[in-house]
Regions:
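Conserved beta3 VAIK motif of the Hanks protein kinase fold
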Residues: 158
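Short, solvent-exposed polar/charged micro-motifs at secondary-structure junctions
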Residues: 89-90, 145-148, 196-199, 213-215
Length: 218
């Protein structure tokens, strides 16, 4: 039986390094570890190159982006475009990445702060993809909506959080929709066992969302 660690090694060695004839496998592995450990954050080739330089590995920006493309093609990481809600167009910068299997995140994580927020955001993203949605990161003039999820004839907005346990978190998650003035359904998903809707925005428990596809509708 193949373990997650051996599956990871097999994908890295066979599906990426060998297929793409990678000449600097150590750099590729560092980039992959960076992307996995920083799931649900904005991708910056410059930042990744800088982190490699700090580790005494020099890789050019174009090579970093080539390696990211190879990793995405191997289905370890998904890359997600931002969408300007006001301008109604996709943006070719500030993309986010999400690890396709949170087991890889647990293997390679290097952070503790806000870990559950990142895990839940990644879970929600992967579930939306599994349900066939086309997913974007929403950009507003005030900030960001975690997800715009589209099917051919519907669209929804989703914010995700670990727990809505203080007023600042509640205001951040529900308030993110203040600058979204259309009438598509809007949701906040968290681990709270008791949920409370606000101003037409539905608050869902994460487990209920994962178990019942009918809870979200466009």
């Amino acid at each position: 039986m193949m373990t997650l660690s051996s599956l990871y090694d097999s994908i890295v060695l066979k599906d990426i390094i060998m297929r793409n004839k990678i000449t600097f496998p150590q750099s590729l592995e560092k980039i992959l570890e960076y992307l996995i450990a920083n799931s649900s954050t904005t991708v910056s080739g410059k930042n990744i190159a800088a982190s490699l330089t700090d580790a005494n590995q020099t890789v050019s920006g174009p090579t970093v982006y080539d390696y990211i493309r190879y990793i995405v093609n191997a289905c370890i990481i998904d890359k997600v475009e931002r969408y300007d809600i006001r301008g109604r167009k996709a943006l070719a910068f500030e993309e986010k990445t999400y690890v396709c299997d949170l087991g890889f995140f647990q293997m390679k994580k290097n952070r503790i702060k806000d870990e559950w927020n990142f895990i839940i955001e990644t879970l929600v993203y992967n579930e939306l993809i599994a349900r066939g949605y086309k997913v974007y990161i929403g950009k507003t003039y005030r900030g960001e909506i975690d997800f715009i999820a589209e099917l051919p004839n519907s669209k929804i907005y989703i914010q995700s959080a670990y727990l809505m346990n203080d007023e600042a978190t509640i205001e951040r998650e529900f308030g993110a929709y203040d600058s979204v003035h259309d009438h598509y359904p809007k949701y906040v998903i968290s681990m709270d066992p008791v949920t409370s809707d606000r101003d037409g925005i539905r608050h869902l428990n994460l487990i209920d969302f994962l178990l019942n596809e009918n809870l979200i509708t466009g």
